[in-house]
């Protein structure tokens, strides 16, 4: 699928996030998800990435955010949130089936946009009171 570039070192270190991580005003699960996607988008934009698309849906899969690095690399971002890490945390909740759906959607998007750019899969996880950015969280060849 995408041509991987040498990954730049990601620290995986948590970034500060408000203690009240789950906005009550959002109401529905979809509203809460959209609020976290917006927070993730703003965080990534502050880190120098540019928004390409949000909520890309194709038959069989969806991508929360598609961003672009300054060097042109497409970054497919899955946003996850968990109140605590009791059951493995937000990042651990992305199983093989979910990764396969992400790959399907990313491949369709990548092909539609010319398929020339390098790409990677990142996860922005909100766990408890922290935001964790996992750069290059998984690769197309290790999804299954």
UniProtKB/Swiss-Prot annotation:
InterPro entries: Restrct_endonuc-II-like (IPR011335), tRNA_endonuc-like_dom_sf (IPR011856), UPF0102_YraN-like (IPR003509). It comes from Burkholderia mallei (strain ATCC 23344). HAMAP family: UPF0102. It comes from the Bacteria. This is UPF0102 protein BMA2801. GO terms for molecular function: nucleic acid binding. Belongs to the UPF0102 family. It holds the Pfam family UPF0102. Coiled coil: none annotated. Residues 1-28 are annotated as: Disordered. PANTHER family: UPF0102 PROTEIN YRAN (PTHR34039:SF1).
């Amino acid at each position: 699928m995408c041509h991987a570039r040498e990954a730049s070192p990601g620290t995986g270190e948590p970034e500060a996030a408000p203690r009240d991580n789950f906005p009550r005003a959002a109401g529905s699960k979809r509203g809460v998800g959209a609020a976290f996607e917006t927070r993730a988008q703003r965080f990534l934009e502050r880190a120098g990435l540019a928004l390409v698309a949000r909520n890309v849906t194709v038959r069989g899969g969806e991508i929360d955010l598609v961003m672009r690095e300054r060097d042109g690399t497409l970054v497919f971002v899955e946003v996850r949130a968990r109140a605590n890490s009791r059951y493995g945390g937000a990042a651990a909740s992305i199983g093989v089936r979910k990764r396969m759906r992400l790959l399907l959607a990313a491949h369709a998007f990548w092909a539609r946009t010319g398929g020339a750019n390098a790409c990677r899969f990142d996860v922005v996880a909100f766990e408890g009171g922290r935001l964790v950015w996992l750069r290059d969280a998984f690769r197309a060849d290790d999804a299954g």
